[in-house]
Amino acid sequence: AYEILIGLVGSEMCIRDSAWSDYFDFERGVDRVDTFGVKTLTSGQFMPLEIRNLAIGLMVPAVMVGLWLVVRTGLPLLWIGVCGALCSLLYPWLKYRAFGDFVIFVAYAILPTLGISYITMGKFLPDVWLIIVPVGLITVAILHANNTRDIGTDVRARISTLAMRLGVKTDIFLYMFEVLFPFLWIAACVALGYFPWWSLLTIVGILPAIANARTMLRLPKEGIGVISNLDEKTAKLQLLFSLLFTVTFLI
């Protein structure tokens, strides 16, 4: 029951945080008619207040479930929830100051993994950090692909992202590291006995990872258009990787 509930809360969190971020991006002028990505606001499909209210409304069930889990498990889970809430609320402000990648790694890799460890085992297991690294890197790669593509429009909006500060050449190599290193990490952990041999099934995901990396390499010659949907492709890679990785621990 816990696993199903955690999955539902995780899905709700993604929708909520996306709506919250979209609202502030539109209000700040980051998202306009000519920007890439989701156009729910820039197209006029929804009003800004509708998106904001959706995000706030989705926070209510998350808080209720979180408090219920705290009662069932223990106070340490409360601090994980508080940190997660702060990451969600402050994300727009932090991402405009080049901390977006860091917040995503914390909110979508560190906190959920530690939380699940505590809920299922009743304590924080140090070995979960071995899981956090590969999953977190690919998750951050989604944002990095997005920010690399949006450098031009982000400059116009007068915000700062890690992609802007690093520059395109470094962005390319960082993205390649984020999507390829996790597979090397898995192989090393298997060889050292930390993960079961079944974890090598995740290597199936290296094919789309290589394809994504090659797409990013084409950026200097072919321009921003070539990575227009690379964030979506990276999200699919993350889903495939996470599913395969999860299955290997269930076999």
Sequence positions of predicted segments:
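Extended hydrophobic alpha-helices typical of membrane-associated regions
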Residues: 194-251
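Multi-pass membrane catalytic core of lipid/isoprenoid biosynthesis enzymes
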Residues: 33-72, 162-195, 232-241
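Small-residue-rich segments of transmembrane alpha-helices in multi-pass membrane proteins
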Residues: 40, 88, 103-118, 135, ...
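Helix-coil boundary and interhelical linker segments in multi-pass alpha-helical membrane proteins
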Residues: 1, 63-78, 112-133, 184-198, ...
